[in-house]
Amino acid sequence: MTSQHREPVTRDRIIDAALHIVDGQGLGRLTMRRLGDALEVEAMAIYHHLPRGKEELLDGLVAHVAVHPLSPAAGGEWQDRLRGWAAGYRERLLEHSGVLPLLVTRRNPAALDGTTASVQEVLRRAGLREETAATGAHTLMGYLIGHAALEARGRALSEAGGPGGAIDWDLRFTGGLDVVLAGLAQS
């Protein structure tokens, strides 16, 4: 592809290319040079869109994966809504499992705050007290991120011939989610 026909570099395109690298090769293989090669630009061109460099890139990856709010206004039973949303969030986390370590190590609270607040609002509208709804939302987010990390690790070990092949991850996920939701329903 010649430079005349190259798609312009944008922040979104940079994040998408970085996700492609992390998803395919792992977080450790993400470098600004490799990212520049993927975008067909010099690595320094990326800094025009991400002035803080790799720090801003990593924050952008976290935001892209972690931000997945639940609409508080949608209808239906709150447990069913949370089950459906949680299943989608799990898929999102597993699709980009290379970013999971960043979700717990980066100082990017805004990325998870909006999503957690949307879950909290659903719980509050379901009749839970404010503090219980806040605790429940954080517990549910912790469960989702923790389960996705364990599942990604287990699947990787299984693919490498290690233990974990006999685990029914879907059953384990829904079983754990049911425990969390049952606890919230009793609150």
Language-model region placement:
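Hydrophobic alpha-helical connector segments
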Residues: L70-A111, E130-A133, A137
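A contiguous pocket-lining binding segment that forms or flanks enzyme active sites
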Residues: T115-Y143, H147-A148
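DNA major-groove recognition helix of helix-turn-helix
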Residues: L50-P51, L61-V62, A137
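C-terminal peripheral helix-coil segments that are non-catalytic and often amphipathic
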Residues: R125-L128, R153-S187
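N-terminal intrinsically disordered/low-complexity leader segments
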Residues: M1-V9
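Alpha-helical structural segments
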Residues: R13-H20, G24-Q25, E56-P72, G84-G88, ...
